[in-house]
């Protein structure tokens, strides 16, 4: 049975309360239970973790090395500036998919920047809670190539960007 770590970063513990027009009315508990059910139906064991603290998230990512088959990760606001989390993902061989409930590419300018995605094998955005299931599907396909620097210029824009697919012809 594959081991998957579901990580949710800062403020995601406030789902259902914070900006329901953007994130919906369902809670983090709803998200975690729905994802765990989907993962179990696909032969995976899930551990759920949420923290508002960068160092705790770094430690959790480090702990996946050699013990976990994949990470589904919504870094929240850390997406836009946390090089510590990006480096943590880069320091382990565990493939990770970055997920966002809303389509961050259509929101405020600062939300369009991800320093995390280059260390991930894919980015899923704007698919609501279903995006987490999409992320698991990508991990189960065995994608291990990371998006890398400048991925936005090499891949077709969209809600789901997977390393090695949808490359722009040069």
Please state what every model-predicted region is.
Residues 149-167:
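A short, charged, Gly/Pro-tolerant segment at domain boundaries
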Residues 45-55:
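Short beta->alpha junction loops
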Residues 64-71:
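Short acidic/histidine-rich motifs immediately flanking catalytic phosphotransfer sites
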Residues 82-91:
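Short Gly/Thr/Asp-enriched flexible loops that form oxyanion-binding sites at enzyme active sites
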Residues 10-12, 76-79, 102-104:
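Short glycine-rich anion-binding loops that position phosphate/pyrophosphate groups of nucleotides
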């Amino acid at each position: 049975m594959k081991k998957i770590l579901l990580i949710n970063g800062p403020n995601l513990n406030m789902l259902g309360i914070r900006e329901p027009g953007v994130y919906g009315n369902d809670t983090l508990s709803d998200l975690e239970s729905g994802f765990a059910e989907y993962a179990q139906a696909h032969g995976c064991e899930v551990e759920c973790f949420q923290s508002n603290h960068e160092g705790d998230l770094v430690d959790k990512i480090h702990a996946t090395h050699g013990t976990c088959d994949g990470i589904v990760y919504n870094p929240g606001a850390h997406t836009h500036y946390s090089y510590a989390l990006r480096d943590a993902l880069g320091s382990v061989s565990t493939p990770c998919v970055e997920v966002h409930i809303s389509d961050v590419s259509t929101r405020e300018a600062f939300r369009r920047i991800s320093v995390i995605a280059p260390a991930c094998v894919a980015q899923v955005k704007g698919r609501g809670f279903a995006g987490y299931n999409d992320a698991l599907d990508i991990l189960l396909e065995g994608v291990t190539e990371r998006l890398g620097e400048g991925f936005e210029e090499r891949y077709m824009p969209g809600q789901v960007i997977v390393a090695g697919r949808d490359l722009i012809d040069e």
